């Protein structure tokens, strides 16, 4: 690291601590040339995920879009914001763990729906109705029937 005062590249680490919920390391350094102390942060570098949309366009993955969609789906429902954060985090890490750099928006939606189903079924239907673009009530009812069938199987 270059010293911010004299630009020397010779420094020693005086102190190291976890920062940002252990996603980074904060280091206090001292320049061996001029004695100036300064702080550096070390973060894990993750490669960007690219979302391939339905129309074939590509854009950078933004976790905020998932979170915003979940918040809208869960309005006036007994779902805590932390649960939505947890779903968003799980989806992001599932995508990153897949090893792919390009992910279809369809795959992202499926990951979200699979996790949301276990949190709140009404919110799941709301999310699915936007994600799956139901054209009529029959499609909505078919989705709800799938939930009922899953519930009956899990009760057995």
Curated annotation (Swiss-Prot):
BP GO terms, sorted: negative regulation of DNA-templated transcription
InterPro entries with a match to the protein in the record: ATP-cone_dom, NrdR-like_N, RNR_NrdR-like
Domain ATP-cone span(s) in chain numbering: 49-139
MF (Gene Ontology): ATP binding; DNA binding; zinc ion binding
Transmembrane segments: none
Leader peptide range in chain numbering: none
Repressor in keyword set: yes
Requisite cofactors: Zn(2+)
Cofactor note: Binds 1 zinc ion.
Zinc fingers classed as unnamed: ranges: 3-34
Swiss-Prot/TrEMBL keywords: ATP-binding, DNA-binding, Metal-binding, Nucleotide-binding, Repressor, Transcription, Transcription regulation, Zinc, Zinc-finger
Function (record text): Negatively regulates transcription of bacterial ribonucleotide reductase nrd genes and operons by binding to NrdR-boxes.
Family statement drawn from the similarity comment of this UniProt entry: Belongs to the NrdR family.
Name listed for the protein in its UniProt record: Transcriptional repressor NrdR
Organism whose genome encodes this protein: Staphylococcus haemolyticus (strain JCSC1435)
């Amino acid at each position: 690291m270059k010293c911010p005062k004299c630009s020397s590249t010779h420094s020693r680490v005086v102190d190291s601590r976890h920062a940002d919920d252990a996603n980074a390391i904060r280091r206090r350094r001292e320049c061996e040339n001029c004695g100036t102390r300064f702080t550096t942060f070390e973060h894990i570098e993750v490669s960007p995920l690219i979302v391939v949309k339905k129309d074939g366009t590509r854009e950078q993955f933004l976790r905020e879009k998932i979170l915003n969609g979940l918040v809208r789906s869960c309005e006036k429902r007994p779902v805590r914001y932390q649960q939505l954060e947890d779903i968003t985090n799980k989806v992001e890490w599932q995508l990153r763990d897949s090893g792919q750099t390009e992910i279809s928006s369809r795959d992202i939606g499926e990951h979200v729906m699979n996790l949301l189903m276990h949190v709140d079924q009404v919110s799941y239907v709301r999310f699915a109705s936007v994600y799956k673009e139901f054209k009529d009530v029959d499609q909505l009812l078919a989705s709800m029937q799938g939930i009922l069938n899953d519930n009956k199987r899990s009760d057995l």
